[in-house]
Each structure stands twice: as structure tokens, then as C-alpha cells.
Amino acid sequence: MIWYVATFIASVIGTRGLAAEGAHGLREEPEFVTARAGESVVLRCDVIHPVTGQPPPYVVEWFKFGVPIPIFIKFGYYPPHVDPEYAGRASLHDKASLRLEQVRSEDQGWYECKVLMLDQQYDTFHNGSWVHLTINAPPTFTETPPQYIEAKEGGSITMTCTAFGNPKPIVTWLKEGTLLGASGKYQVSDGSLTVTSVSREDRGAYTCRAYSIQGEAVHTTHLLVQGPPFIVSPPENITVNISQDALLTCRAEAYPGNLTYTWYWQDENVYFQNDLKLRVRILIDGTLIIFRVKPEDSGKYTCVPSNSLGRSPSASAYLTVQYPARVLNMPPVIYVPVGIHGYIRCPVDAEPPATVVKWNKDGRPLQVEKNLGWTLMEDGSIRIEEATEEALGTYTCVPYNTLGTMGQSAPARLVLKDPPYFTVLPGWEYRQEAGRELLIPCAAAGDPFPVITWRKVGKPSRSKHSALPSGSLQFRALSKEDHGEWECVATNVVTSITASTHLTVIGTSPHAPGSVRVQVSMTTANVSWEPGYDGGYEQTFSVWMKRAQFGPHDWLSLPVPPGPSWLLVDTLEPETAYQFSVLAQNKLGTSAFSEVVTVNTLAFPITTPEPLVLVTPPRCLIANRTQQGVLLSWLPPANHSFPIDRYIMEFRVAERWELLDDGIPGTEGEFFAKDLSQDTWYEFRVLAVMQDLISEPSNIAGVSSTDIFPQPDLTEDGLARPVLAGIVATICFLAAAILFSTLAACFVNKQRKRKLKRKKDPPLSITHCRKSLESPLSSGKVSPESIRTLRAPSESSDDQGQPAAKRMLSPTREKELSLYKKTKRAISSKKYSVAKAEAEAEATTPIELISRGPDGRFVMDPAEMEPSLKSRRIEGFPFAEETDMYPEFRQSDEENEDPLVPTSVAALKSQLTPLSSSQESYLPPPAYSPRFQPRGLEGPGGLEGRLQATGQARPPAPRPFHHGQYYGYLSSSSPGEVEPPPFYVPEVGSPLSSVMSSPPLPTEGPFGHPTIPEENGENASNSTLPLTQTPTGGRSPEPWGRPEFPFGGLETPAMMFPHQLPPCDVPESLQPKAGLPRGLPPTSLQVPAAYPGILSLEAPKGWAGKSPGRGPVPAPPAAKWQDRPMQPLVSQGQLRHTSQGMGIPVLPYPEPAEPGAHGGPSTFGLDTRWYEPQPRPRPSPRQARRAEPSLHQVVLQPSRLSPLTQSPLSSRTGSPELAARARPRPGLLQQAEMSEITLQPPAAVSFSRKSTPSTGSPSQSSRSGSPSYRPAMGFTTLATGYPSPPPGPAPAGPGDSLDVFGQTPSPRRTGEELLRPETPPPTLPTSGKLQRDRPAPATSPPERALSKL
């Protein structure tokens, strides 16, 4: 326990002792603090208080070493005491530390901190702590020279620059940016610069630079040197033209700068020249201006600046005044010597010099070259070898230079004079001792008397000599200088003559050598010379030499051995300047020294190390495998001292490099390696050779020789042969294509021309006449074309193969034929589009000739119909064109078949009249509607129902107009009915379908229908005979089945014809009565008392049965067709071309209606209200027209579905669906189920022909239609082409080869060959069967039908 108490007491005592020592502030180790100028720093000082008790009060004092009083005192809460140097920058930090802000370089030093405890005693020595503060600062100058300092020229100047910084900076001097070091001119020591022997070159800016790691400081001082002026910009030579102002500049600098400038002309002040002082001015900057210069102002001008210090400098320049050439002081008389050469001079003054001098003699230009012995000199003078009297005259000269001329000279008269001559000549040589007297004679005479003068050749003599009045030269005492060549000159106005002599002075020292030459090397010099006159005694030579930089007393004499005139001097220093001279001597003395020659010996060749030649290896070696080898390419070395001489190419396959080529030119950058082994890996590298050095190898490029094939041959221009062959082949193909196209075009044109020659049918068209009060028929005028209609068909010369009797064509027909040719050629060349063809057809191509009556309605006059029944066909429409809608027309035309014309159609040929020039054409044919749907055969009831469903059937009630909605023959209007308006054809687009109106068929036709009453010369019934029927069927796909009616699917009437029975047996009960058409009630045969002039063309008659939409019509029994022989098949509704070019529609004959099927007169029944005329002689058309005045013109009224007034089928409501039919194949003939019939057009309509009217028989051929009129065909609604006849044997009998018209099908013609049928056409009885072997009955078919009924 006691031990623990003692230990506690000891620890307390120890603690108190430590506290006492801390309070007393025992000294600690000094602290070092570093700061940068401008920063803040804390000088640390700690205070230790007792462990127990309250801290006693204390005072903090900070001292700086070297400052006697504290710089900072702090006690308690009282404000501190701060030294003024630290005011605002010193403060107490923590308890006793000192904080200094913005420290400066002056703050650097030792600082002491003292803490005084007020309640304790302390030891002064042991109390306090020391801190050393180091301030790092950039250099700053404490002493610098002034910005400008002056120094006199020739004196010296010292400039001192002192800098302070931490660390201590280094001070250097620079002049104009160049560092100055210790030299003879400048001395640099501890920041001071001393310049000795100050000159003008020492002036300028001097810079003092003090720098350390903390930064640098720079001070600049300008040294001004006092002295005379220095010309900075001297004047320069100038050239001005006359009357311009001259400007000479002169700028000088000096310190002080009180400069004055003085100008001199030819060493005389410009202000002292009378003519110049009024035209000059000196500016303050020293510039001299001379106004309106004259030629006399040319010369040297000198500028002298001055500032009253020292000697003034000067600078000179020359002024050149340019002016046109002029003549000065032309003498009025020019003397030319006689017998010797003379000159005619022109005193020219020009700047620049004269280039041309032109002479005039006696007012005329002088041709100098034309005078023998005359020469024009370069200065413009004329040299005359020997003057004669021809040279006499008055001369003027006109000089020219680049500026022109001032005019010609004053006139000068040429006078011939004798030249002066010597009366006494001096001797060749005179020898006399020096000091003696000598007289050399010389005398001359002439007119005028010459003046004699003497002169020494070369250097003038300064000895005492004179020329006597007699002309002699007198030497009173000869001297050494008199030695030499002398000349005696006699001169007058004519010319000057000379005489020479040589004077030798004996007894003198040698003359000086001449022509000294020195050839030097590095240590030797070879001196040579030409000796002078020896003075009459033997002379010797010596060579004198010295270094050029030595003084005049350092000459060294080298004796020359007697004889030679050269000396080799050796032991010379290389690259040193030496001076040489030669001295001659004899016994009387020495000569003068020759001229001094200064030369420099050559320097020893400095042995320099061989220059380092840097050759880098070639770059970017690339190996490209080609079909023939390997193409190696590279770039030249990046660095090379000299051009590359060549390249070396190496390769390796294994480990060893082998040489491939070592002679590749240095300008190349590619190499082609050939003849390589197959399937081998190659590595290549390239080296550059420059002089004798070889560079390092380039990078290694590897490539395999696999798949290397021979490269295709290249042409000289670099193209591969396949490419060239392709180009040539393409060119040849194009050339061949062009050639074949040209040949094809020529062939087509030739064929077209042959076809045009073969086809002579004119364009047949349906036109309407322009408004006219009378037609050609009504007016009684018969054109030449109308004669054709009166001829019989058998009279045609074309069809008979005989030469055609060409007749004179009317202008109208010629115009139509030209239009026909142009349109045909355009369409046949396939250049017409459909729209273009339609437009052209509308403008130029008529469809059918129709005469317009006085009331504006279209008229077909039956009065002109010829009653011939031999041929019953309508001439073909040659303008029918096969299009996408109607291909059968072109095919039918191309078939070139010429079937025989039925007798019912042949009667219409003679009633056609030619076109009139006042007629216009209808629109082109309608577009084909793809909505056409072939339908099955229906009965009359079905057709009637369909027409009623589509709105085409007329009600039984009477209508205001008999024409209804279709074309038809109208009966005479009853008194109570309103006259229908005339029909005018509007100009519309392409119609939908074509409608062809037909008159009643003749009674003697083969189909059992009555003929037109006018042809038999009998009156007609007043009843209406409907002649139109719209069947409902289409083409049957079976060749031997019952054909469908293609006309049944149209909502337009299309082709309106009477029905036709198929060629099969009909039950007796179903056959019509005699005299009545089949399928019609007997009430339809009411014959009127008189035949009407206008007949109504009724709507088509339908079958009595279901409508098309209610069910198909059953096909006829096949047994009815089995007993018929194989005949060409023609589908119903087809338009077949005949030999006349007309499309013949194939119409079905309806099944016979049962009795009572129609309860009365039906509008849709076939109305046969024709009276049966009695056989009687047929009058001619004109006789019939005169015999029956009640016959009127047949007028066509517009139908509701007229192709010229209606819209397309697709836009009509209630239209049956139409479907596109398949394109028929030309040449295939099907067995006809029913006979065909052609309708006879009105008499007012004519079909023109290209040649004379055709009068051939029905069996004869005619040309097919013109292709140019095919697009305008109006009957292409439902027409189809003919199929080709099936293969089989030729017909054996007359009836085997007959078609349904009783005609023999004509094969295709070749050239102009026309085939004729062997047998006449058969007739078709009322039963519908062909009678081939039996003769034709005497009675007409209508009579047989009526008798049977």
C-alpha cells in the first residue's frame, strides 16, 4: 500500500514538472517553411498549458531576425500590435501561430515566437521557437539602364542590369534578338554590358534578360549613336521622257536628326544652274523633284545630307531623259573628197539611240543601196567609196528612234572637193639619244588649206615638244617619255589624212614591262609578262611580291634569270592573297613597276569524312497473282541522298534467297515475275541500289503460283481479245440487223406495191351526202362513174383476165383514190394506232355511200337498181381491218378467197353509184366488247322475251314514228301521224356496232323470199315487211352441231336479215303456207295495193319461247345433219368476204312456228306482206321509175341503238352480258347449217372501184379489200373469219365444192392468177336443200313456196 502511494506522489510531481517546463516554453528545433510570392503562409507556434487548473494569461510575441522590436504582439482579447510592413497581412492563427497573407520576397528570413506566461517566471533563453521562411519569387530587376541611352561615335558605353529573385536569376544581354558574348567589341560581366569603339552599326535595341526556374524578366534599352548622317535610301538611276517630272529620293538617318539635304548636278548645286533652278524643288525628306525635264537635264545628281556633326556622306544617281531623235547643227555644206572615200554625216541626237535614218536627195527619198559604192552606216551616215558628180545635190536626213522623230534636218548641199595631201612626209623611224634635239618634218596642202597636228599613239607625252607652222615636229630635248609611235594629221573641211613615224630614244633606262599575268596553285604562282623597250642596253627583270594585307614596305624582290620572261614563285601559303609586280633594269637604271596584280592561292583540300548516305529499304512490296504470273509492285525508299540507280529483286522457295533480277531501273516500281513453277509458294523481296550502297531488303511478300493460267491475248491498245471480239460482234450484229431491217422493209414495200397492183377495188364506204338541194340522180346528171352501174356483171374485163379498158376518171374519183392509197399504205405499214386510224377514217375514209335528200334524210333510191338477177351479191368492203376486236376481217381478206356471189346479191352490183366529193364518211368501226356471251339457239318466243327484257321490243300499240328504235324501211305516213324528223349523223366517237339496212329481197331469190317489186316492175304492198332478226345464239364449239347465234347477245340490232331455215327436213305441219315466209302467221301476207316508197325496217324478230335468261334452246337432232355431205362450215353471225370484198353475214333461219303461236300480227314476226307479182318483162330502172310515179326514195331513219348515236355497251342498262370469242383460224371451213344471204344496199349508195366497173360473172374473182379502210369498216360487230376447209379430196361434182351460197370456194391467189369455178352456182329451194343436179325451176322460189302452202 505504501508503495502505491509513493508511486502516485512521484507521478504527480513529475507531471507538474513537465507542465512547468511547457509553460516556460522550452526551445524546439527550428522549422523551415517555403512559400511562393503572393501566397499565404502560417508560421506555427505551440502553447502548452498546465494539466490542472485554469490556463494562465499569456502574451504572444513574434520577432523577425534583424528587426529589434517585435513585428507582432498579442495579449488576450486586446487588438494585436503589428509592424507597418506587415500591416494588413499578419494575423494570429490558432493560439500563437502567425499567419502572413500576400507574402513578399522581403518577408523571407528567420522568425521567432515567444509566449510569456504572466503568473510564472521563465527563462528568456529557453523560451521561444524559430521558423525560417523562404519565399520563391520570379526574377525582378532592381537596377536597369534607361530606355534610351546616347553614345558618341568612336567612344564606349556601359549598361548595367541587376535582378533579384529566389532562386537567384541569371542575367544575359541580347542585341536585336542575338545573344551577345564576350568579344573584342562587347564585354558582358555580372549583368553589365560594355560596348567599345561605338560606331553607327552599334546603334539599336539591347535587351537584358533575367531568368530562373520561377520565370524571367526582360528589359530593353535603345542605344543612340551621335554622329554624322547615314544615308539609308540612296537615290537610284531613273529614266523619264521629255516634258515629264523626275523624282529622285534620298533618305538619311542621324542622331541628332536635324538633317539638311543638298543636291548637286554635275558637281554643281542645282540652285546655281540658271536653266535648272527654276524647275527643281527639294522636299524635307530629301526628295528632289525636277519639273518638265529637258534633254539637257540628263546627267549625274548627288545627294548630300548633313547634321553639323562630322563629315557628311553623299550618294549619286543618273537621270536619263528620253526624247525623239533629232538633228543638231546640220552643216549647210557637206564636203566630200574626190578620188577617196568620203562621208555624208547626219548629226543625230537621240535617246534612246536612233534606229533608222532616212535620207532625201533633192526632195526625193534616197535609195542608198541602189547607188554603187554607197553604204549606210550604223550611225546613219552614208559612206561613199569614190564620189562622183552624180553625188551632187541637196541632202536632208530624218532620224528615228523608238519614240519617233522631231523632224528632218536642215538641207545640206554636197560639194566635191579635192582632199588634202602631204607635201612632206615624216620618215619611218627616228633614233636619237635622250637629251638631244630632234626635228621631224611634215607638210600638207589642199583646198581649203589643211591644218597639221601631231599626236602620240597610246599614252600622251608630257615632254617639251611642239608643232612648227610648217607642220614639222620639234623636240628640244628628248626624254624617255618621247619614245614611241607618232602621227602627223592634216585636216581641212573635206577630210583628214595621217602619216606615222616611230621615235626611238637611246640611252635611257628600260621601259616598264606590260601584260603581267599570274597563275596560282595552293603554294605556287607562275608570273609572266611582256618586256618593254630596254633603253638601248641589255635589261634584266625582277618580280616583286607581298601579301595583300601587309603594308607598302613588305614587298619582296625575286630576281629573274636572264632570258625568260616568266618566273615560278613557290613556298606560298594556301588560300592567301598575294600581290605581284615586275620591274626591268639595265645599266642605266630601272624601269617603272608594272601594274600590280592581286591573286589568291588555292586552299588545301579539306579532308572531310565521307558523307553519310542514308538509304532506306523500299516500301510496301505487294505481290498480285495474275493469269500469267506474279506482278510485284513497291514504293521507293522514303529517304535517300541520291537518286536510286536500280533495284534488285530476290526470291526464295526454301530457305535460301536467290537472285531474280538485279537490273530493274530505279524509275520503275513494278516487276512481273513469269515462268514460275506450279503449285509453289514464293516469297519476294526488293533492295535499292544507290551509287555503291545497297539498302536493307524490303518487306517480304508471299504468293502461291497455284491456278496461274495464261492471260488472254491483249491487243496493242490493251484490250483483251474476247472483249474486242465482243465489241466487233456487237457492231456486226447491229450492222446486220440494220441491213436485214432495210431488206425486210424493201421486201414489204415491194409486196405491198404488188398487192396494190393486184387489188384494184376502190375503198367502199357508207357516207352521207352533204346538204344539197339535188342529188346527181335527181338532177338528171349522170357522171362517168354511173355508167358502171348499168353494165352487166359479166362484162368486167378485170375478172375475165383480159386487158382492162381504162376510162377517164373524174377528178373526184382521182382524189378518192389518192386518199385511199395514202391511208392504205399508212395502215399496212403498221404505223396507225386504233385511235389514229379511227380519226383518219372519220376524216377521209367513208363507210358507205348514202345520198342525202333535200329534207336532210339519208336516201337510197331504188329507181336506179338494175333488174339483173344474174349475180346476187354486194361488192366486198376492202377496208375491213382485222383488229383485236374483229380479227376475222383481216383473215378473210388475207385468205384472198373469191367465192361465187349469190344471185340475190349480184343484182345489187349494177345499182351502185360512185362516191361523190361532197360526201362524208361515217365514224370508224366500234370497239369490240368483251362482254359478248354466245348463247344457245332460241325460238322466236325466247328472242321476243329477251328483247322485251332489254327494252328493245316495241309494243303492239302504234308509235308516232314508224322507224322506232332501229333502222328500217318506213311506210308512208298516215294522215294522222306526224312526219318523223330527218336523220343527221352526229360526230361522235367510235360506235359500238354497225347497222346495215337492207331493202326487201327479190322474189326470185334462192331463199324463198319475194324480190323487190321495182325489179319486177310491179306494185308493192302497202304493208311493212320486217327484214331484221337478232338471233340469240353464238358459235357452236362442235363443228357439226347446231351453231349458236352470235347476233343474239347484242343489244344493238347489228345485222338485220330475214330468218333462214337450216338445210334439213321440216315437218309438213310446220312448213309455212305457199307464198308466206316461214315462221310467220298468214296475217303477215297482206299485200297493199301499191308498193310504198318508204318501207319501215322493223325490229329484229325473236323466237317464240323463252328469253335468253330463262333457259337454252335445245339443239336440233343430230340425225338431221348426218345425211349432209361434208361442206365448209360457217358459223352464224360471221362476216365472210366474198370476191367483191363484202362481209357476208351468216344468219340462221328460225324454226317454223306452230300454228297459232302468234295470235295476231306480231311486231316481232317476219312480216311478209309482199304482194306476189306476176312474171312480166323487167323494165330498166329508169323505165320503172317513170312507169311508177308512186315509188319514192328509200329513207333510213336513225335507230335507238344507232352506232353513231349510242354509248358503249357497258354503259347501257339492261344489256346482256357479252364475252370475247376466240380468234377464228383462217382457212378452216365448217359445214353450214343454213344458207347465207347478202343484202342489196340502196341504189343511192355506190361502191367505187379502183379500175373500170366490174361486170364479171359471180364466179369470177375480185380483189380483197384495201387494208387502209379496214379500221373504218362498219360491219365488224359480230363478224368472224372463215375456218379453213378440212383436208379431203377435191370435189367430184359440181355440187361437192359448193358453199352455202351455191358458190365454189376460191383458193388463195398467187400473183395475179384468178381461178374460175367449173360449175354455175346452184339454187336453194324453199325446203332449204341444195339442188345440184336438177335444173333450176322456171318459177321463182317465192312462187313455189306459195303454191306449196
Curated annotation (Swiss-Prot):
BP-aspect Gene Ontology terms: cell adhesion; nervous system development
SUPFAM superfamilies: Fibronectin type III (SSF49265), Immunoglobulin (SSF48726)
Subunit structure as annotated in this protein's UniProt entry: Found in a complex with MAGI2 and NLGN2, where it interacts with MAGI2 (via PDZ 5 and PDZ 6 domains).
UniProt cross-references to CDD domains, sorted A to Z: FN3 (cd00063), Ig (cd00096)
Domain spans labelled Fibronectin type-III: 512-604, 614-708
Database matches in PROSITE patterns: FN3, IG_LIKE
Compositionally skewed regions (Low complexity) per UniProt: 985-998, 1251-1271
GO cellular component, one term: postsynaptic membrane
Signal peptide segment: 1-20
Protein function: Transmembrane protein which is abundantly expressed in interneurons, where it may regulate inhibitory synapse development. May mediate homophilic cell adhesion.
Name this protein carries in UniProt: Protein turtle homolog B
Record-listed Omega-N-methylarginine modification sites: 1136
Disulfide-linked positions: 45-113, 161-208, 250-303, 346-397, 442-488
Gene: IGSF9B
Post-translational modification: N-glycosylated and sialylated. Not significantly O-glycosylated.
Domain Ig-like: from-to ranges: 24-129, 139-226, 228-320, 324-415, 420-504
Source lineage: Eukaryota, Metazoa, Chordata, Craniata, Vertebrata
